[in-house]
Every structure is written in structure tokens, then in C-alpha cells.
A protein has these predicted regions:
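ATP-binding pocket architecture of kinase catalytic cores
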Residues: 1-83
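Structured catalytic core of nucleotide-sugar glycosyltransferases
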Residues: 15-16, 21, 25-38, 42, ...
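A cross-family kinase active-site recognition segment
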Residues: 58-112, 134, 240-241
Length: 270
């Protein structure tokens, strides 16, 4: 339901490009005539290849290293990918999304949350980098979108938030998703070091990107905080869908907002 049918050719081309470059991603399955897009019950439909592996809930530093390297290889492969898709959940979308949540809705989740969210929107809009490399990114590489075979990555899946964005923002999203306990209360320095080492062994970060990383990390947290807030406010309590705790990403945001925390990320690298 969340996929715009007009975006399907972008996703198809993206996955084919990555597959042809040797990245472990699923492929669209074609019919005898070579067509990958069908119509079922009046709606667009396609079949996606199955990949072996399991998603981990408590990743190890070694698994994080493998994931960082896989993300780096994906970014390297996408350097010459020419199609583009706007990021509908980028920095320009966060304030409108916060307004749709309403101040009362945000306050129903936690006292003071509305003021915190809009202050963060102000800060990020004023400081969002404009001089970093832009490319196609995954934008949602949580542990449940990485299939592990032991300590090795068996596949990267669920590219339906893929878009054109600052490349390092993808690393920020992945870091915020992988390096904390599920509730955001515990930061794992070993997993962080592994993830960053795996990525930078493939895609080294220049000084400008390292300097911008604190902003990108905060942006990643605000994005998921807001989408979780919106779902929390607008999903009935008796719905079959399980709502995800927005405050897990507020805690991450608070962590990354610490003045020395991001410098420590690189200090703790293996």
C-alpha cells in the first residue's frame, strides 16, 4: 500500500543495477515474455526473489562490520546510477509532518515533545549540509532489512524507501538503527565501531562528511521519531498493526545531540 506504482520502475532499475554490480539484493522475477510488472485484481504486482538469511535483533560487532561493508559496497555500486527519486521524508518534510502530528498529539506521547520536535526542526533546517555527495540510498537499513548468514550478509532487502539523498545520510540512518538497544536506552560502542570500520574500509569519509555527521545523525533520528509519532497518533489502539515506540528515537536523538558523542564514535573505532 505504501508504494506508488509510478516508482516501481525506479526500484526495478535500482535492484538490477545493484545485482549486476555484485551486490546481494533480491531481483524482480520476470515472466516468459521478460515482463516483471503484472496486474492482479486491478493492481500492479510483481514477484521478488527469495534470499537466504535471518534478521538479527541483537547484532554483534562482527555482524555490524559486515553490514557496514555491505552498505559501502552498495554506495560504491550506486555511484554511477543515474535515475533519481526525491526523498519524500527528507529535511523539507519534517516540519510539515510534525504539524500533521499536531502539538496536542505530540504532547500526548510525552510532555514537552512538541517544543523539542519543533526546536529540532529549526536547528536542522538551519544546519543541514548542502555540499555533500548525493546519490541513490537505501534510507531504511534497519537490522530487519539485512539478512545475515552467521557473521556475513546474505542480502539487503526492502528498498521501498530508496531515494536520492545525501549519501552519508544512509550511514546515519543505519548507525541509528543498529547501534542502540531497541528502546534507545543503551548505545553499543562495539557495534558502532564495527559498523563504521566496515563502511569506511570501503567508502572512506572525507573531512566534510565527518564534520556533517552529527547533523545527519540527528536528522535520521528526527525522521523516524516523527513517522513513529504520526503512526502512534493515527493508528487505533485495536488495529492489527503494532505501533512502534517513538521515544526510542527521541532517546537516540538526545544521545547524538551531546556535544562530544560523535567525536567519540570515531575514537572508539577498532
Amino acid at each position: 500500500n505504501r508504494v506508488n506504482p509510478d516508482d516501481l520502475p525506479f526500484f526495478y532499475a535500482l535492484l538490477k543495477h545493484l545485482h549486476d554490480a555484485g551486490c546481494k539484493v533480491p531481483q524482480f522475477i520476470t515472466d516468459r515474455d521478460g515482463q516483471w510488472l503484472q496486474t492482479v485484481a486491478g493492481r500492479p504486482a510483481c514477484l521478488i526473489e527469495f534470499l537466504d538469511g535471518v534478521s538479527v535483533t541483537e547484532p554483534t560487532a562482527v555482524q555490524a562490520y559486515s553490514t557496514g561493508a555491505a552498505l559501502g559496497h552498495m554506495h560504491k555500486a550506486l555511484a554511477n546510477f543515474t535515475l533519481a527519486r526525491p526523498n519524500s521524508l527528507g529535511v523539507s518534510a519534517w516540519r510539515p509532518l510534525a504539524l500533521r502530528c499536531t502539538a496536542d498529539g505530540l504532547e500526548s506521547i510525552a510532555a514537552g515533545l512538541s517544543e523539542r520536535v519543533f526546536a529540532e526542526c529549526d536547528y536542522l533546517e538551519a544546519h543541514w549540509p548542502s555540499n555533500l555527495p548525493v546519490a541513490a540510498i537505501h534510507a531504511d537499513l534497519f537490522p530487519d532489512n539485512v539478512l545475515m548468514l552467521g557473521d556475513h550478509v546474505g542480502g539487503l532487502i526492502d528498498f521501498y524507501f530508496a531515494c536520492t539523498e545525501i549519501r552519508a545520510y544512509d550511514l546515519a540512518v543505519t548507525h541509528s538503527a543498529w547501534c542502540f538497544s531497541n528502546d534507545g536506552t543503551v548505545f553499543d560502542t562495539d557495534v558502532s565501531a564495527g559498523l563504521l570500520a566496515g563502511y569506511t574500509d570501503i567508502m572512506p569519509l572525507d573531512a566534510a562528511t565527518q564534520a556533517a555527521l552529527p547533523i545527519l545523525l540527528r536528522g535520521a533520528c528526527l525522521r523516524f521519531l516523527l513517522t513513529r509519532c504520526y503512526d502512534w497518533i493515527n493508528t487505533p489502539a485495536n488495529a492489527l498493526v503494532t505501533r512502534k515506540d517513538p521515544l526510542a528515537f527521541l532517546r537516540r536523538l538526545d544521545f547524538y545531540s551531546g556535544p562530544s558523542e560523535v567525536e567519540n564514535l570515531f575514537r572508539h573505532r577498532a
